[in-house]
A protein has these predicted regions:
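Ligand-site clamp/hinge motif
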Residues: 191, 218-265, 398-402, 408-412, ...
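Surface-exposed binding/hinge segments that line
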Residues: 101, 135-182
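Detector for C-terminal structural segments
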Residues: 209-213, 218-220, 278-283, 312-346, ...
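Bacterial signal peptide processing site
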Residues: 18-22
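Aromatic- and charge-enriched surface segment that lines or borders ligand/interaction sites
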Residues: 88-132, 148, 154-156, 243-246, ...
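Alpha-helical secondary-structure segments
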Residues: 115-122, 150-156, 201-202, 229-231, ...
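N-terminal lobe/hinge region of extracytoplasmic solute-binding protein
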Residues: 37-93, 124, 196-202
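Gly/Pro-rich hinge or "lid" segments in bacterial periplasmic/extracellular proteins
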Residues: 68-76, 170-227, 231, 241, ...
């Protein structure tokens, strides 16, 4: 269902057909429309449940946070933030609480005022075990939120930490209590609100045709002002070639990541900007440490096995083959742009001979008849999931398959449409998978969410169920240290621990180039969220569709 090609005529007929729904729609029906070609549909439209980049793009436009980061993405203190839902804030003398003043003009899209109790309710929803939010770990250390009055929410912490303000302002999306309080928490994803969300952002929800397109419309009376585009439309274009052609031909305005031949064509096109916007993305092969593979319980739970597979792969050769100059070998669960990173840290080097010796020592011997490594009559074989929407990860899957075959390891590459790929990761129904993660500006938040030890069924985004007590303890210490030098040293120690432990095979970090129609002047394209300032993007001309190249 994600293989549907983009049809410009169908898109514009659908958008126009929405114009008669209500006065709000009528006022923006003929306004400027921004069309985004996206490789996958949103996974959810409730912030507490969203895990995909596409879902995050939509919910960031529909819902507000207390404050918004500036482009420098500073995570210590509050200097790197500007007001969003909160018009002001006041620190307590002991820094254990912050009182946020809600803008009295803020309204939900149903007309109801936003109140402090909505802030309190939103945190409770993230932390409710029945909701099972993958973002619950982002709020570790926050004691509670109290309501001082209808427009003042006070956030309380158990301990002081350098990233207190960032922790609450960046991570807490505010949702309406009056519409969600009576919804069953365990089935929130199936609620009516999940299909027709109501936020307080500069865009309001309009239409969602699953696996095809999603539309939001400008909230013309929003307290932060009317955005420049009357509508934003995401068109699901799972085929990477079709997605590239849609922007090259002028049928779509934005493709957030363009690579290969499409990048060369986009560079040459006078109708497009190719804009590099930084990267907090890294790709890796996650291994399910609890899975029985090749007849061996917890095969990837063995560090020696993970190290052997890492050493068997020539990652530099793979990056050169698949990305050329548009990527670099990943060093760990971070990107080189992070200030906490030491790029000279020790790595597991490519050494296929050493990898073979390790596998021999683990009892996986090469069978002379078929050249496969076997143990107790079982071949060393695993399934590798890749999302069909990512041409780059599909290339890496084939390259990994070939390189591991050379040392007697059999890999079955299994492309899956994005929805099924995500579902199997979340359920733990996989041997290994090629995943991509957009790191949080805070190393504490990202590392806990993706690599912190699971707590029972609460795994966050740690799909491989990886656990390392030393790593977790080092992160916990770093979270409370105010000295910049000491924090950096602790982060380096944590990074070295997880790299030495081969928690994953760190594959690549891409250089992110967006292809954007030349009629548009984008602003504020942050490395963590290129869409962050989308309501303020400028339009300097009209879209002109051309014949497909």
């Amino acid at each position: 269902m994600f293989a549907r090609r983009y049809h410009a005529l169908a898109l514009f007929v659908t958008v126009a057909a929405c114009s008669g729904k209500n006065a709000e729609s009528t006022s923006v029906a003929s306004a400027k429309v921004l069309t985004i070609a996206t490789p996958a549909d949103a996974d959810a439209l409730i912030p507490q449940l969203v895990q995909s980049t596409q879902g995050k793009q939509v919910t960031d436009l529909l819902f507000d946070h207390l404050a918004q980061p500036t482009n420098n993405l500073e995570t210590v203190g509050d200097a790197g933030f500007k007001p969003q839902l909160a018009s002001a804030w006041t620190w307590a003398p002991d820094s254990l609480s912050i009182a946020f003043s809600i803008n009295p003009a803020a309204r939900w899209h149903d007309g109801q005022p936003v109140r402090a109790k909505d802030v309190q309710f939103s945190l409770a929803l993230y932390n409710d075990a029945a909701v099972a939010s993958p973002h619950a770990s982002n709020f570790i250390g926050i004691d509670s939120i109290s309501v001082r009055d209808s427009l003042t929410a006070v956030v309380w912490w158990k301990h002081r930490s350098p990233e207190q303000f960032f922790q609450i302002a960046f991570n807490l999306a505010i949702v309406p209590e009056h519409l969600l309080a009576k919804e069953a928490r365990a089935t929130l994803a199936q609620s009516a609100f999940a299909q027709h969300p109501v936020g307080s952002g500069q865009y309001r929800f309009e239409q969602w045709t699953h696996d095809r397109q999603l539309i939001v419309a400008a909230d013309s009376t929003n307290f932060r002002g009317k955005p420049n585009f009357g509508r934003v439309v995401w068109v699901v274009t799972a085929d990477p070639t079709a997605a590239s052609m849609s922007v090259l031909s002028g049928q779509a305005d934005v493709l957030e990541s363009v690579r290969g031949d499409a990048f060369v064509s986009a560079r040459k096109s006078p109708q497009l900007h190719t804009i590099e916007y930084g990267s907090l993305d890294y790709a890796f092969m996650v291994m399910n440490t609890e899975r029985t593979v090749s007849g061996n319980r917890r095969l990837f739970g063995d560090r020696a096995m993970r190290v052997a597979l890492t050493a068997a792969l020539n990652r530099q050769a793979m990056v050169s083959n698949a990305l050329d100059s548009l990527g670099a070998v990943a060093l760990g669960p971070f990107t080189r742009s992070a200030s906490s990173v030491d790029t000279t840290m020790r790595q597991i080097a490519f050494d296929s001979v050493a990898a073979g010796r390790t596998l021999d020592s683990l009892g996986w011997k090469v069978d002379a008849t078929d050249k496969l490594r076997k143990k107790n009559g079982k071949a060393l074989k695993f399934e590798l999931l890749v999302p069909s929407s990512s041409a780059t990860r599909q290339k890496f899957g084939v390259l990994i398959q070939a390189q591991l075959a050379s040392i007697g390891v059999s890999v079955d590459v299994a492309p899956l449409e994005p929805g099924m790929f995500a579902t199997r990761l979340e359920k733990g129904d996989f041997d290994a998978a090629l995943n991509m993660w957009r790191a949080d500006p805070s190393p504490i938040v990202s590392l806990r969410q993706v690599w912190g030890a699971p707590h029972g069924k609460e795994i966050g985004a740690n799909y491989g169920r990886y656990a390392n007590a030393q790593f977790d303890a080092t992160l916990d210490t770093a979270a409370l240290v105010f000295s910049a030098d000491k924090r950096k040293a602790l982060f380096r120690r944590a990074y070295q621990l997880i790299v030495d432990d081969a928690a994953a095979v760190w594959l690549y970090e891409p250089r992110n180039f967006a292809a954007i129609n030349a009629r548009i002047e984008p602003t504020g394209m942050r490395a963590d969220a290129w869409w962050a300032d989308l309501p303020n993007w400028n339009v300097v001309g009209s879209r002109v569709a051309t014949a497909k190249p």
